[in-house]
Amino acid sequence: MTMAKNILRAITAIVRRDAKTPDTDDSAGSVTFDGALDDLDVAGLVEVGRGPIADIAIDADRETIVVTNSAADCLTVINPYTLAPVGSVRLNGEPFAVAAADDRAYVSVVTAGHDAIKVVDTITGSVLAEYPLAMTVTALAMSPDGKRVFVGRSGHDRIDVAVIDTAAERVGTIDLASGAGAGVDALRVDASGKRLYVATTDPRGSRMVTVNIETAQIESTVWIGAPIRDLALGADGKALVLTSDRQRRGVVHIVDLSTAAVVGAIQIGGAPTQLVLSPDATRAYVVDYDRVIVLCTLTNEILGSIDVGMQPAAVAVRRDGARVYVADYSGQVNAFDVAAELPALYSRLVASEPRQDATTVLPSLQTA
């Protein structure tokens, strides 16, 4: 059993190398920038060294970085200040998606008998809990307050979302649909924590479904068509839905959530697998099979792309928008600083509280 996004990534594992002549910074391997990305600077490179990285997440409170190493069956914690691995946690199963909050990492893990969500203490490296789940886990999301984890599941005759109450340690269910061939491809929770947006697919095509979390009822459905790879919630009541297929290749569909209608589209090409918005929703980082495409969501234009020299796997953006991390299938994480002041693109960053010493914040974990 594997996650839908990782199936696509495996299919597109052959890296296309385009001839480029942009500026290169040798301090982080063979990173190159293409297009109008003068505000991006290479901050460093993390050599995780445990094989391909499937996903990456940031714990917003401490800015701790966590990555899942699918081939090594472990989760690795990275110090954001030194850009060095703190340690790895053995998970006894193949990890894929990960979300993090409050010194906890929630990891979807495939084992021989079942799929599960494992909870890891990112300070001590202990596995605190495991939630075995029926069916196949294909998507993962967390509420803004970190109190609920949403898990998309696909079975042979139905799809649903398991809801984990992280405080009460209980699991509920939101039923979505029944029928053969259906799947859940992506999940997102809105800023209020009241609505869940679900990307679903069946033999007829794909849809984005809006669910009222408190009532567990579907409120609206938007027809998309092509297979959905990811989705994100932008500004002004808009959602960005990423699709790719052989006919149109990569497309970002713009959905008006108030009318539940597609109001625009951005053609990006390639075979993209992930879309992540900056905190102010002015930029979208799209993971393609050989680069990360950067979109301006204010103008719906492609600003440029980032080539890290390896096939990128996943992107994470710090909550102030000033740092972007690109994980790849070679087991590396490239860090990029984003300029704080860009006219018409970024709001002013809120001053953060003083950071604690890194050795106090992130004590060493037991190496897996």
UniProtKB/Swiss-Prot annotation:
Function in brief: Stabilizes the MmpL3/TtfA trehalose monomycolate (TMM) transport complex under stress conditions.
SUPFAM superfamilies documented for this protein: YVTN repeat-like/Quinoprotein amine dehydrogenase
Organism: Mycolicibacterium smegmatis (strain ATCC 700084 / mc(2)155)
Mutant phenotype after disruption: No visible phenotype.
GO CC annotation, single: cell tip
Superkingdom of the organism of origin: Bacteria
Primary subcellular site in the record, as a coarse category: other
Quaternary data: Interacts with MmpL3 and TtfA.
Protein name, per record: Seven-bladed beta-propeller protein MSMEG_5308
Subcellular location: Cell septum; Cell tip
Origin organism lineage: Bacteria, Bacillati, Actinomycetota, Actinomycetes, Mycobacteriales
UniProt xrefs under InterPro entries: Host-pathogen_enzymatic-act, Quino_amine_DH_bsu, WD40/YVTN_repeat-like_dom_sf
Leader sequence segment: none
Entry coiled-coil feature ranges: none
